[in-house]
Amino acid sequence: MTIDTRALGFGSSDRAVYAADPWTSRGRLYPEDGSPTRSDFQRDRDRIVHTTAFRRLKHKTQVFIAQDGDHYRTRLTHTIEVAQIARALARALKLDEDLAEGVALVHDFGHTPFGHTGEDALHEVLLPYGGFDHNAQSLRIVTKLERRYAEFDGINLTWESLEGLVKHNGPLLTPDDVGTRGPVPQPILDYCELHDLELATYASLEAQVAAIADDIAYNTHDIDDGLRSGYLTFDMLEEIPFLAGLMAEVRARYPHLEPSRFTHEIMRRQITRMVEDVIAVAQERLSLLRPESAADIRAADRVIAAFSGQMAETDSQIKAMLFKRIYRNPDIMRIRAGAAQIVTDLFAAYMANPKEMQSHYWVDHIAGLADAPKARHVGDYLAGMTDTYAISAHRRLFDHTPDLR
């Protein structure tokens, strides 16, 4: 039987002229035949979902250690929430929803066990060998470390998806090739030698909405988890005018609401107001820029998908509250110190005796290597661990493992 591609619904949405177009994609590093039933960006999104790295997000920390409770968010639940917000923004702005969703789904692949604590610890032990950067690690995963296909390593994503992964937070280089946030990680520079991701320009608007969706999701849901854990209280939220206004609005409409429902009503309003703010700002900036293609978005002198000045101030206030009340809470700091010790101990143990990694693939690849490449392989192995696996690996090798509860 044959497929009538003219009758298919995919790829027929009303995209804006400045949206990324899968039919004119800059292609993949390893050329492949197209699909008669899916656009290239759909295929990217599907490949991302089927990776081992995606499944591992289930047991990687967002803020609270993955063993803390069934209802706290992990990297996977956070990623799904980011993808939902990114897709909503993409639809409102007439962008390619599949590309926006794909960038959102892949953006946290490079995160280590134990969240930013694990990343900081791994960066510290890898400093003599080039350090560690989760964004560069995400690129390594999708271009090298995932091994599923017969003809290439990685998952061979399109240029647009990789560009979005690497540049979703903005250009990495100035026009004069100076790093915008310090030196560009070597894995990114190495890949650009093969497939230039144009590090001095902005990413597509699809990637930009994925980035702002990440901010919206983690601010909102860290508040939710903070209230659930007891590290935050409603009185603390009242200190931020934006949140105080939302709470007053909910109380006026539902004066006797139970706390769990009250929390949800605040969170849903926070997400809605932030999404609407981004849409309004993007529409205003698009009307001024008047882009005629996705290339005009990349060449713009500022980000298009952003918060207004007032909402950006609210975003900063929320981040400051979360940092003070949760991230720097003594209980969380104790847990973070223990998590860092686990990563540091495992790195030292595997460098001293790679056979302790209990993986034939990694042991075979490390045998006979000098310290620098060996350290990178050990770093890859550690970065891929889930929280629970890292804890169990430490218990197997050491008499005392820090209590992360």
From Swiss-Prot:
Any one of the GO BP annotations: dGTP catabolic process
Keywords: Hydrolase
Domain HD: 75-219
Family annotation (SMART domains): HDc
Cysteines paired by S-S bonds: none
SUPFAM superfamilies the UniProt entry points to: HD-domain/PDEase-like (SSF109604)
Protein family (similarity comment): Belongs to the dGTPase family. Type 2 subfamily.
PANTHER family on file: DEOXYGUANOSINETRIPHOSPHATE TRIPHOSPHOHYDROLASE-LIKE PROTEIN, DEOXYNUCLEOSIDE TRIPHOSPHATE TRIPHOSPHOHYDROLASE
NCBIfam families to which the protein is assigned, alphabetical: dGTP_triPase, PRK01286.1-1, PRK01286.1-3
HAMAP family: dGTPase_type2
Protein name: Deoxyguanosinetriphosphate triphosphohydrolase-like protein
Species of origin: Rhizobium leguminosarum bv. trifolii (strain WSM2304)
